[in-house]
Amino acid sequence: MVSSPDYNPNILNRSEFDIPLAESSLDEAPFFNRAISGSYPPASTIKPFIGLLGLEEKIIDASTIIEDVGFFQLKEDGRRYRGWKEDGHGKVNLEKAIVESSDVFFYELSSKLTIDRISSFLAKFGFGETTGIELLTETESILPTRNWKLGNIGETWFVGDTINIGIGQGYITSTPLQLAVSLSAIANRGIIYKPTLVTQDYGQESNQKTFASVKIKNQSHWEVIEKSMISVINSWNGTAHNLYKEGGTVIA
């Protein structure tokens, strides 16, 4: 668990060291543990969850094609939501949408899913909650709902809000640790392990506690999403292909 920027731990050994004073005087707040206290938009890392929900709700299947022309236009008001790639990604199925991070694919999908289903599904993976790690400064992230927006912003929910959530922007936030724990559930086929601090490696004797277990209707959907995530690195057109190493460990 890493937080950057770091600091020299030796300065904490000095009896006269004043941590609050140092925090206020040092640039970029190195004593702020971003891994558990920083709350940020999850951005495109939310897309595998939205894709999985789309499969589960039968809004799409693995072969569904959406034409990504660089923007998605709302029928209600004609407003255009642009993707990061100006000229679009062309014909896109779910795997390509995750591999190339097509915003337009997930704009359209999330608009059909609605915020109610999205929020309920993400909550199962721990979004909007702390992980329960044994550290006092862990921040609870935001999983917005219609009632959350009405109570905190004083406005009703709009379809445009849902579209933003579909690409991990807007009101939704997560801590780096919470996001890592949630994403690990895809590799673990729905099992979410509670992160914990350890003093040594207990090997096979370790009795790691589960935080929750996400049940889905079709188990093959785990493989569809995991394969797409792996291809983000292993495929030449993946947005993280620069991390690929020949013969190295496959990661997603």
Predicted regions and their residues:
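Beta-lactam-recognizing serine transpeptidase/beta-lactamase-like catalytic domain environment
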Residues: M1-S44, F49-A252
